[in-house]
């Protein structure tokens, strides 16, 4: 009996390994950026963790800054198209959309290692203006635009009061920044279950913050909604 190779089988193992290297390097870099920060991460340590040489890393990423940019694009920036498509297709109320978006953000970003990128930029952005400017362009600006679309939807449909949307954006962002900073600072020191615990369940926190925010935004009979 003749066994025919599949297309995948015909690809040399070394070539398959080569194709996987950028992803392996970005995974290693993400872990180290979150653990040690941008300044504390050395490219040779990234290469070692990925199981390749420093020279191999530079074949794919010419500098640590370019490696950082690739990590951000891979783990955060690439999701904005998906989220905008979801917004376009959403059939529920805008209050339901806000709850959905905040919980989805936690599941896709907040609960993953990628959330540590935000803490890194907030901590080290002033020292590395190039990565701060990149993060603003690739994450903050499209993120703000997406949130503004959500809030505008509510105003246009008569569900939300006509507030200053440019500032209302930060009412949604602030709880997310808080829970990220908590996760990567105090949370490891405050295990869940301790009596008098200070730890916070992220999903409960996000749902509660969304509820408080929406009660402030929603049009209510008998209240000055202007």
Predicted regions and their residues:
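Amphipathic alpha-helical packing segments from all-alpha helical-bundle domains
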Residues: 96, 107, 111, 116, ...
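Basic, helix-initiating cap at the start of DNA-binding domains
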Residues: 1-36, 40-52, 59-66, 92
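Amphipathic alpha-helical linker/stalk segments
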Residues: 69-101, 107-109, 113, 117, ...
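Helix-loop "lid/cap" segments that line or gate small-molecule binding pockets
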Residues: 103-110, 118-126, 213-217
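Hydrophobic/aromatic residues within well-ordered alpha-helical segments
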Residues: 21, 64, 75-79, 94, ...
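C-terminal peripheral helix-coil segments that are non-catalytic and often amphipathic
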Residues: 1-12, 96, 100, 104, ...
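Amphipathic, non-transmembrane alpha-helical scaffold segments
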Residues: 18, 26, 72, 132, ...
């Amino acid at each position: 009996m003749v066994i025919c190779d599949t297309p995948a089988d015909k690809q040399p193992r070394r070539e398959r390994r080569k194709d996987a290297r950028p992803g392996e390097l970005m995974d290693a870099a993400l872990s180290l950026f979150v653990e040690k920060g941008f300044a504390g991460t050395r490219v040779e340590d990234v290469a070692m963790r990925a199981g390749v040489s420093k020279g191999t890393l530079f074949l794919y990423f010419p500098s640590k800054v370019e490696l950082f940019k690739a990590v951000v694009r891979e783990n955060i920036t690439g999701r904005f198209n998906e989220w905008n498509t979801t917004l376009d297709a959403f059939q529920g109320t805008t209050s339901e959309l806000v709850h959905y978006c905040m919980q989805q953000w936690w599941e896709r970003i907040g609960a993953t290692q990628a959330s540590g990128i935000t803490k890194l930029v907030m901590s080290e952005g002033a020292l590395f203006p190039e990565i701060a400017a990149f993060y603003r362009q690739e994450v903050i600006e499209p993120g703000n635009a997406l949130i503004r679309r959500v809030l505008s939807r509510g105003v246009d449909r008569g569900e939300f009061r006509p507030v200053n949307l440019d500032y209302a954006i930060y009412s949604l962002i602030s709880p997310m920044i808080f829970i990220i900073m908590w996760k990567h600072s105090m949370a490891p020191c405050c295990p869940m279950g301790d009596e008098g615990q200070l730890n916070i369940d992220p999903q409960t926190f996000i749902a509660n913050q969304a509820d408080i925010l929406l009660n402030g935004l929603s049009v209510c009979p008998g209240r000055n909604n202007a």
